[in-house]
Amino acid sequence: MAILSDRDIKRYIEEGLITIDPLDDPERQIQPSSVDLRIGNEFKGFRVIRKPCIDPKDPSDIESYMETFHVEDGPFIIHPGEFALATTHEYIALPEDLVARVEGRSSIGRLGITMHVTAGYIDPGFHGRITLEISNIGKMPVALYPRQRVCQIVFETMTSPAERPYGHPSRDSKYIGQTRPQTSRIKDDYEIRNSRL
């Protein structure tokens, strides 16, 4: 596998192999081996409710814990210890022979903010806005502004195209085409759905 350079990223975009929409400021967003992505304006945060735990087997459970916030003007404030979901402002589409990784920008990390908890890997064939799993591990609240550059995407070539890329009918591609922050769809995992646990 090889990481795409800035010149390769530009070529892939020009040839329609990678979609990044909108890419409003390519000169600022395209870095030597990545593309800076911005945060969208919709956030999902946990409500405080009285339940002992989140149960992945209860399909109504997970959504009931989340509250949606739309931010048009001004910041979304994330407090120490809080967790929120958001998406990138940009819609991303990958071909069947390219994977991507999302990493938080160093400037954001130095404020105590992580941009993804575990889901930094993007499968070949994915298209949609990338979910950001944001948490504040610092000691101060931090303001995040819609369309602020918060993360970067790195592209890597594969040795051959995927036989069953993300979105293939035979795959459980639960988040294909997402345009808004999506809560966990763990209830759709095979072992949960078929009561294998």
UniProtKB/Swiss-Prot annotation:
This is dCTP deaminase, dUMP-forming. Pathway: Pyrimidine metabolism; dUMP biosynthesis; dUMP from dCTP: step 1/1. It catalyses: dCTP + 2 H2O = dUMP + NH4(+) + diphosphate. Disulfide bonds: none annotated. SUPFAM superfamilies: dUTPase-like. Belongs to the dCTP deaminase family. It is an enzyme of class 3 (hydrolase). Its EC number is 3.5.4.30. Keywords: Hydrolase, Nucleotide metabolism, Nucleotide-binding. The active site is at residue 133. The keyword Zinc-finger does not apply.
